Amino acid sequence: MHDPIADMLTRIRNACMARHATVSIPSSKMKLAIAQILKREGFIQDFTVQEGKPRNTIVITLKYTPDRRPVITGLKRVSKPGLRIYTKRADIPRVRGGLGLSILSTPRGVMAGHEAWQQRVGGEVLCYVW
């Protein structure tokens, strides 16, 4: 697999469209950090890490509105292995007029765009969530 983060976003997108309750994703530190941000910002209900022999797995519990519409309506991978996208603090993008979220990989770790702006750091724009 060339882009594990894109794979994670695609699995979440497909599970939301199919109205699944949970989705399983192979674990890594970066994916765990992204899942923590999605939970903290209210886009997913919860996540757990299941220990496994060959590899640990992240099980994400998706969040839906009372009328069974997914809270996550869109996910977009921005910086890709073939074309990295970096941004300064002043240029951190707002997603959907502030209704969405940008996730950045900074020297201080993976964080949401508004957190990076508050901490005055820029970094690699991993993805947008809305």
From Swiss-Prot:
Belongs to the universal ribosomal protein uS8 family. One of the primary rRNA binding proteins, it binds directly to 16S rRNA central domain where it helps coordinate assembly of the platform of the 30S subunit. It comes from Roseiflexus sp. (strain RS-1). PANTHER family: 40S RIBOSOMAL PROTEIN S15A (PTHR11758). One of its GO terms (molecular function) is structural constituent of ribosome. Gene3D superfamilies: 3.30.1370.30, 3.30.1490.10. Part of the 30S ribosomal subunit. Contacts proteins S5 and S12. InterPro entries: Ribosomal_uS8, Ribosomal_uS8_sf. It comes from the Bacteria. The lineage of its organism: Bacteria, Bacillati, Chloroflexota, Chloroflexia, Chloroflexales. Keywords: Ribonucleoprotein, Ribosomal protein, RNA-binding, rRNA-binding. GO terms for cellular component: ribonucleoprotein complex; ribosome. This is Small ribosomal subunit protein uS8. SUPFAM superfamilies: Ribosomal protein S8. GO terms for biological process: translation. The keyword Cell wall biogenesis/degradation does not apply.
